């Protein structure tokens, strides 16, 4: 059987036809056009998915299901998206809307969750039963795979790992709490620390790298200087890794996965991040004499959303 996988982002919708092994047979995309409202976007999601089959030369008779990954939360009990900030969606009945365009079963989940599923089917965690996917971008997102299946919890929020508190009474988070993990382990955290550094040391190499414009600092700027041995950026990066490892340790204690996969923008520095995490993690895991999760880098990158969404329908 074949599956339609659809990756919905704030800027584009990507669809692919995927086989049982997670191979993409055909894919194409279109702009999201969020400003048109959810009805028009969902119509395009459906039409793009269905046209993917037609353009691939395959038949709809071969397709078992449609899977959709969204940058928000999906309530599996009701078929409603309670909120999805990037799409400006609130209480959107996506399953009912999709029924206007197809009789195929439709499955929807968070985009980080489907990326984790993709890695467990076709990527670095393939062959494992229990794995976690952690995406390090503007915030921190996650996907939980237990016994080879997506685990989203009773209310669809089991993978909102970025909002577990790792620093009691810490920095305020956009969610309203203080001390959330993503305030310390995201790309945004590196940018914030870089801006503080430049404000305190206007002549530092980081300030020179961005031509004196603090607003232009990126996580990559900070990491690049750390990789080149700049003392201040090394300090920032080491502190970042510490907070990342604290959160990973909590996840290991709760889920005991075989593999934790790191994705997102920060992970693009590759072995520099991976080696730092692997070096520090043994100091914080609880059972130091027993095996614990190995940490790896995501391998599927841009195709993970399509593959993982498609695999939602395989279960």
Identify the meaning behind each predicted range.
Residues 1-65, 75-78, 95-106, 118-128, ...:
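ATP-binding/phosphotransfer module of carbohydrate and carboxylate kinases, centering on a glycine-rich
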Residues 7, 67-71, 133-139, 143-145:
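Short beta-strand segments
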Residues 11, 114, 138-141, 161, ...:
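Conserved A3 ("GATE") glycine/threonine-rich loop of ANL adenylate-forming enzymes
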Residues 28-30, 85, 154:
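Short hydrophobic alpha-helix segments
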Residues 31-34, 89, 158-160:
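A short acidic/small-residue loop/turn micro-motif
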Residues 81-90:
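Conserved phosphate-binding/catalytic loop of the ribokinase/pfkB sugar-kinase fold
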Residues 108-112:
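Short loop/edge segments at beta-strand edges and connector loops
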Residues 144-160:
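Short, charged low-complexity linear segments at domain edges
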């Amino acid at each position: 059987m074949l599956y339609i996988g659809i990756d919905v982002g704030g800027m584009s919708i990507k669809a692919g036809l995927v086989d049982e092994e997670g191979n993409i047979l055909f894919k194409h995309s279109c702009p999201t056009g969020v400003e048109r409202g959810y009805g028009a976007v969902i119509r395009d999601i459906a039409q793009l998915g269905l046209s993917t089959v037609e353009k691939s030369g395959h038949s709809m008779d071969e397709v078992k299901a449609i899977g959709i990954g969204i940058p928000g939360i999906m309530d599996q009990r009701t078929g409603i998206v309670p909120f999805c900030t990037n799409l400006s969606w609130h209480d959107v009945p996506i399953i009912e809307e999709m029924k206007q365009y197809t009789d195929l079963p439709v499955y929807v989940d968070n985009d980080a969750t489907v990326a984790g599923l993709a890695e467990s089917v076709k990527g670095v965690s393939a062959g494992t039963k229990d794995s976690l996917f952690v995406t390090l971008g503007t915030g921190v997102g996650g996907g939980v795979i237990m016994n080879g299946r997506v685990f989203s919890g009773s209310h669809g929020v089991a993978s909102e790992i970025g909002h577990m508190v790792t620093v009691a009474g810490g920095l305020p988070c956009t969610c309203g709490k203080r001390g959330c993990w993503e305030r310390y382990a995201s790309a945004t955290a590196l940018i914030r620390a870089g801006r503080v550094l430049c404000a305190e040391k206007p002549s530092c190499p980081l300030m020179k790298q961005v031509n004196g414009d603090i607003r232009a600092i990126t996580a990559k700027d900070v990491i690049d200087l750390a990789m080149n041995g700049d003392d201040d950026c090394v300090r920032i990066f080491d502190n970042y890794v510490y907070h990342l490892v604290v959160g990973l340790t909590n996840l290991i204690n709760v889920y005991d996965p075989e593999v934790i996969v790191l994705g997102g923008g920060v992970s693009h520095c590759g072995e520099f991040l991976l080696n730092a995490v692997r070096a520090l993690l043994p100091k914080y895991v609880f059972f130091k004499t027993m095996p614990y999760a190995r940490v790896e880098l995501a391998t599927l990158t841009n195709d993970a959303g399509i593959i993982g969404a498609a695999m939602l329908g395989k279960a």
